[in-house]
Swiss-Prot record:
Belongs to the KRTAP type 16 family. The keyword 4Fe-4S does not apply. It comes from Mus musculus. Keywords: Keratin, Repeat. Residues 6-81 are annotated as: 25 X 2 AA repeats of G-[YCGS]. PANTHER family: KERATIN-ASSOCIATED PROTEIN 19-3-RELATED, KERATIN-ASSOCIATED PROTEIN 19-4-RELATED. This is Keratin-associated protein 16-3.
C-alpha cells in the first residue's frame, strides 16, 4: 500500500484508483477511505463518508458525494439511502 493521489485530486493512501481493486483515503471534500472505481472496500468514492466502493463494487457507503448503504454506479450521486449496482 503506497500513497497515491486519491480518487480525484486528494491525498490518500492505498492502491488502485480507477478500475482495480484497492482502497485509498480522501478525495475532494471529506476524509474517507474507499476504492476508486469498480472495486470493493471501505469508504466513500468522491467526497462523502461511510464504507463502500466508489463506482461499481459493493459495500456500505456512497458513490459520489453523500452517504448511504451500498451504492453502485452514479445512481446515488450526491444523495443518500439504499442503492444498488445501477
Amino acid at each position: 500500500m503506497s500513497y497515491y493521489s486519491g480518487y480525484s485530486g486528494g491525498l490518500g493512501y492505498g492502491y488502485g484508483g480507477f478500475g482495480g481493486l484497492g482502497c485509498g483515503c480522501n478525495s475532494i471534500r471529506r476524509l474517507g477511505c474507499g476504492c476508486g472505481s469498480g472495486s470493493y472496500g471501505y469508504g466513500s468514492g468522491f467526497g462523502g463518508f461511510g464504507y463502500g466502493s466508489g463506482f461499481g463494487g459493493y459495500g456500505y457507503g456512497s458513490g459520489y458525494g453523500g452517504y448511504g448503504y451500498g451504492c453502485g454506479r452514479p445512481s446515488c450521486c450526491g444523495g443518500y439511502g439504499f442503492s444498488s449496482f445501477y
